[in-house]
Swiss-Prot record:
Cofactor-binding details, from the entry: Binds 1 Mg(2+) ion per subunit.
Binding site for IMP: 14-17, 39-42, 126, 140, 220, 235, 299
Principal cellular location given in the protein's record: cytoplasm
Function: Plays an important role in the de novo pathway of purine nucleotide biosynthesis. Catalyzes the first committed step in the biosynthesis of AMP from IMP.
Enzyme class name: ligase
Pathway field: Purine metabolism; AMP biosynthesis via de novo pathway; AMP from IMP: step 1/2
Pfam families: Adenylsucc_synt
Biological process according to GO: 'de novo' AMP biosynthetic process; IMP metabolic process
Assigned GO CC terms: cytoplasm
Family to which this protein belongs: Belongs to the adenylosuccinate synthetase family.
Protein name (database record): Adenylosuccinate synthetase
Gene3D superfamilies the UniProt entry points to: Adenylosuccinate Synthetase, subunit A, domain 1 (3.40.440.10), Adenylosuccinate Synthetase, subunit A, domain 2 (1.10.300.10), Adenylosuccinate Synthetase, subunit A, domain 3 (3.90.170.10)
Native source organism of the sequence: Campylobacter jejuni subsp. jejuni serotype O:23/36 (strain 81-176)
MF terms (GO), sorted A to Z: adenylosuccinate synthase activity; GTP binding; magnesium ion binding
Upper classification of the organism: Bacteria, Pseudomonadati, Campylobacterota, Epsilonproteobacteria, Campylobacterales
Length: 416
């Protein structure tokens, strides 16, 4: 019996998980998404061609991989169908859990309307309806992908839901679709998606029993976890390794190696605490060189220095076996590079994450920069200062680096 390896982001998302998964996919039979929705975005570069994936696992770019969208994901049929249209021959290579919850048009309308009402206190969501979809799931009023197999019945259930919540929709100025419009959409979803809908948990159990190689692909980052992130500025699902198992129906004994994906600096989209944010020239330089624009939202990411306190925290949360250090090349040409080794909090120096992270100040140490690592594929060819930087990050995080990315391209990766 084999075990499922897990790839997990350990900052605020956008760490480069897609590139790592894409690089590793050739060694796996199954690649699986476990949580989130189309608020997540993976960018993968292959031979100069850019692929942006939001719902589909990154294994879709490898013909031998079977790709699974698990029960913990909230699925927008509209978005998924559009994404599927980019690829050929998906039959037998893509499966969607019949237990995954649906993310429908009204969810995004609710999301946008509620954010608008909050004004300056808005969370800074993607507006994709992810929170409202998970809210329906927790309230036990949601609908699941398996219900698409009976579109007439699902349509009737949704119309009843809309009528029961008519006052709520009117307050948010959201127009309720007609039964005819809704049924037409559901029938279209049914026609296209039915061949892909199945019990993916049983499929994975069988795969592990048959010693197949399985990779679980995390979405977003551990600092956005609903329980362990910077609440309330978090996502609506569990983004840590334990959540990856839950979101696919696997048990803790079925977890294999856990690899944490981390940028050589730090970024964050939206509002919320971000201790190492640099609002000056260095932060702007990182943003420009790193092309730090959100894949799903098009929003500019906030940029700053490596936060070793946060990474050490998320390394423990996830039980990491190794790190994959991404976008090291973005720091090429910096004379000095900062690392946050601790925080100042209420007059004390601390090395942990308090629940009110917005009240800390970073304590930095500086290291000498380097000229260029871009495109290097051999560790021995890295500049000495880059090697020292990597060694210091390992020391502060308490986890060894196994992979180093030196450009957006798939093959520009050092494996240690």
């Amino acid at each position: 019996m084999s075990k499922a390896d897990i790839i997990v982001g350990i900052q605020w998302g956008d760490e480069g998980k897609g590139k790592v998964v894409d690089k590793l996919c050739e060694n796996y039979d199954f690649v699986c998404r476990s949580a989130g929705g189309h608020n997540a975005g993976h960018t993968i570069w292959v031979n100069g061609v850019r692929y942006a994936l939001h719902l589909m696992p990154s294994g879709v770019l490898h013909p031998r991989c079977i790709n699974i969208i698990g029960n913990g994901v909230v699925v927008s049929p509209e978005v998924l169908i559009a994404e599927m249209a980019q690829f050929e021959n998906l039959k037998g290579r893509l499966y969607i859990s019949d237990r995954a919850h649906l993310n429908l048009k009204h969810h995004s309308l609710i999301d946008i309307a509620k954010e608008k009402l909050k004004g300056k206190n808005a969370i800074g969501t993607t507006g994709k309806g992810i929170g409202p979809s998970y809210a329906d799931k927790i309230n036990r009023t949601g609908h699941r992908v398996g219900e698409l197999l009976e579109p007439q019945r699902l349509c009737e259930a949704l119309i009843k839901d809309f009528e029961a919540n008519k006052t709520f929709f009117e307050m948010l100025e959201i127009e309720i679709p007609s039964a005819e419009e809704l049924l037409a959409d559901l029938k279209r979803f049914n026609e296209i998606l039915t061949p892909y809908i199945t019990d993916t948990t049983r499929m994975l159990w069988k795969a592990l029993d048959e010693d197949k190689r399985v990779l679980l692909e995390g979405a977003q980052g551990s600092m956005l976890d609903i329980d362990h992130g910077t609440y309330p500025y978090v996502t609506s699902s569990s983004t840590i390794s334990a959540g990856a198992l839950t979101g696919l129906g696997l048990n803790p004994k079925e977890a294999g190696n856990i690899i944490g994906i981390v940028k050589a600096y730090a970024t964050r989209v939206g509002n919320g605490a971000f201790p190492t944010e640099d609002k000056g020239e260095d932060g702007e330089k990182i943003a420009q060189i790193g092309k730090e624009i959100g894949v799903s939202t098009g929003r500019k990411r906030r940029c700053g220095w490596f936060d070793a306190v946060a990474v050490r925290y998320t390394a423990r949360l996830n039980g990491l076996d190794a790190l994959s250090l991404m976008k090291l090349d973005v720091l090429d040409g910096f004379e000095k590079i900062k690392i946050c080794r601790a925080y100042e909090y209420k007059g004390m120096e601390i090395d942990y994450i308090p629940s009110d992270l917005e009240n800390v100040q970073p304590i930095y140490e500086e290291m000498d920069g380097w000229d260029k690592v871009f495109g290097i594929k051999d560790y021995d060819l890295l500049p000495e200062n880059a090697k020292k930087y990597i060694a210091r990050l390992e020391e502060l995080a308490g986890v060894k680096v196994k992979y180093i990315s030196t450009s957006p391209e798939r093959d520009d990766t050092i494996i240690l």
